[in-house]
């Protein structure tokens, strides 16, 4: 439908493309300043904000979350560390009572639920992707320590100083340049896999054994609550766009994200402004947890502190490539940095494709790019 693609190499923009349409009826063309919901790419942005607080000594990743957020420390959550929230091993990957979808702008309703609920598994026992809860968990930590929301913090500390076109929580004035997202349900692919639960392990490869185990635990449908998909247009509503959902509703341009990851891949500094120190970037892009991920179909995802280091079937972590860190989004958007190439890469789109084709375009673009610059 529509997309933008940008690459920053050694602090220079070498690719900046956009085209297609912003809506299903093809009445609005995708323009240079069109922004789009990048979904879970937002997690990387949220992690960057927390990284700034970590390197300033305001947060210690090895301390318990309850040290900063006392109300959180109950029902088995007493020992969960900040690090475990960041690397998806905290056991808080879903809402036990289901996710409220009637008022996305009510931050406190999500916080109260997370404070009161019990863990799904012992902290550190499994890697289980915190698909939506990640944003409220990390966002509340930031708010407790700094006083600002994630959207406010990123705007003040990163976006405005570096002229990066990316926001978590839009204003109504942004709606005119915002592309609609055409979503498909994730449930058909999940339903196609369910028969694996009844296939004897003898007939399964290791990767399908992991998928079978993940399906049996049913963490997948817990984390990706089916009620969200009852109205697949919810991501285009004013309520969703105005809310701050730091795991899933960041909006921006490919140019902005390529610039951001380009800076982080080149030491974290542009001119006199330092986003993160090199040692912080290095720590955040180290592998801190390794799959099989019990939410992401048992696949061997590798996570740093909020960053994906290896994401199967996407450009991030493909074989014979550099040291990558970034994130993907459920509608097909991808942004990452490569420290070996001092490069930032971003492909953003507004039409979700099915299953194995979800990241097909970004993989092909990344492969073509590396064939040129290698």
Model-derived features: where do they sit?
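Short, conserved catalytic-motif segment at the N-terminal edge
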Residues: 1-39, 60-63, 116
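Active-site SXXK
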Residues: 11, 34-62, 138-143, 257-260, ...
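Flexible glycine/proline-enriched surface loops and loop-helix/loop-strand junctions
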Residues: 31-33, 117-124, 134-136, 237-246
């Amino acid at each position: 439908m529509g997309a933008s693609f940008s690459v920053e190499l050694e602090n220079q923009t070498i690719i900046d493309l956009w085209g297609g349409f912003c809506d299903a009826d093809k009445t609005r063309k995708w323009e240079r300043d069109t922004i789009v919901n990048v979904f879970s790419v937002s997690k990387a942005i949220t992690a960057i904000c927390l990284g700034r607080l970590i390197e300033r000594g305001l947060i210690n990743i090895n301390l318990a979350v309850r040290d900063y957020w006392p109300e959180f420390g109950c029902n088995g959550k007493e020992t969960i560390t900040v690090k475990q929230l960041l690397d998806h091993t905290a056991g808080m990957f879903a809402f036990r009572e289901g996710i409220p979808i009637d008022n996305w702008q009510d931050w406190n309703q999500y916080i109260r639920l997370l404070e009161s609920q019990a863990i799904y598994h012992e902290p550190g026992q499994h890697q289980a992707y915190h698909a939506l809860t990640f944003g409220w968990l990390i966002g509340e930590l930031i708010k407790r320590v700094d006083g600002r929301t994630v959207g406010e913090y990123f705007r003040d500390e990163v976006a405005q100083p570096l002229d990066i076109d990316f926001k978590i929580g839009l204003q109504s004035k942004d709606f005119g340049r915002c592309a609609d997202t055409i979503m498909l349900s994730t449930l058909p692919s999940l339903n196609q896999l369910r028969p694996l639960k009844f296939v004897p392990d003898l007939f399964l490869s290791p990767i399908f054994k992991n998928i079978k185990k993940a399906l049996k635990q049913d963490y997948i449908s817990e984390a990706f609550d089916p009620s969200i998909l009852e109205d697949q247009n919810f991501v285009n509503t004013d309520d969703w766009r105005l809310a701050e959902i730091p795991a899933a509703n960041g909006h921006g341009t490919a140019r902005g994200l390529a610039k951001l990851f380009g800076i982080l891949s080149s030491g974290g500094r542009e001119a006199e402004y330092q986003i993160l120190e090199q040692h912080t970037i290095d720590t955040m892009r180290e592998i801190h947890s390794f799959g099989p991920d019990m939410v992401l179909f048992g696949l061997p995802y590798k996570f740093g502190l909020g960053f994906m280091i290896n994401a199967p079937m996407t450009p991030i972590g493909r074989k014979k490539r550099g040291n990558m860190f970034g994130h993907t989004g459920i509608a097909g958007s991808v942004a990452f940095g490569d420290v070996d190439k001092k490069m930032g890469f971003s492909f953003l789109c507004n039409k979700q494709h099915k299953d194995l084709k979800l990241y097909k375009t970004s993989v092909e673009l990344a492969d073509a790019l590396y064939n040129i610059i290698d």
